[in-house]
Amino acid sequence: MPLTPNDIHNKTFTKSFRGYDEDEVNEFLAQVRKDYEIVLRKKTELEAKVNELDERIGHFANIEETLNKSILVAQEAAEDVKRNSQKEAKLIVREAEKNADRIINESLSKSRKIAMEIEELKKQSKVFRTRFQMLIEAQLDLLKNDDWDHLLEYEVDAVFEEKE
């Protein structure tokens, strides 16, 4: 067990003939006791300071660990968001490409259909024109026919006179 200042103060020595001067020994022990008290007080203060610093180090270590975990969680979340964004972007691009292909195919189909309708209308137009031309020519032939002249020479009064 370590010495205490009281152990030093209360220490008694046996007296012998030609021993140490008692006053000198007591003065020395008193000085040793004071110095020892100072050392013990400083030791206690330093131990308290060490404990306080250990607690602070522990606290900061906990904060550091918490921050590191938070950083890892944030990084993982950022990676998840990035991966999900990339997947979503790929899906959007794929969907846009499908829509573009569909629109192009529909446009091509419509343009082919319109081209076929135009060709059909051209054929119908030629047929109509030919028939119309034939009709007009037939009408012109009727106009050029001498029967018109014969009708003009026909007299209506003569028809009524004959019947009477």
Curated annotation (Swiss-Prot):
One of its GO terms (molecular function) is identical protein binding. One of its GO terms (cellular component) is cytoplasm. InterPro entries: DivIVA_domain, DivIVA_fam. Changing A78T: In divIVA1; loss of function resulting in sporulation defect and in the formation of minicells. Residues 29-107 form a coiled coil. Induction: Constitutively expressed. Keywords: Cell cycle, Cell division, Coiled coil, Cytoplasm, Septation, Sporulation. One of its GO terms (biological process) is division septum assembly. Belongs to the DivIVA family. Oligomers. Interacts with FtsZ, MinD, MinJ and Spo0J. The association with Spo0J is transient and occurs at a specific point during development. May act as a pilot protein, directing MinCD to the polar septation sites or by inhibiting MinCD at the midcell site of division. Required for polar localization of the chromosome during sporulation. This is Septum site-determining protein DivIVA. It comes from Bacillus subtilis (strain 168).
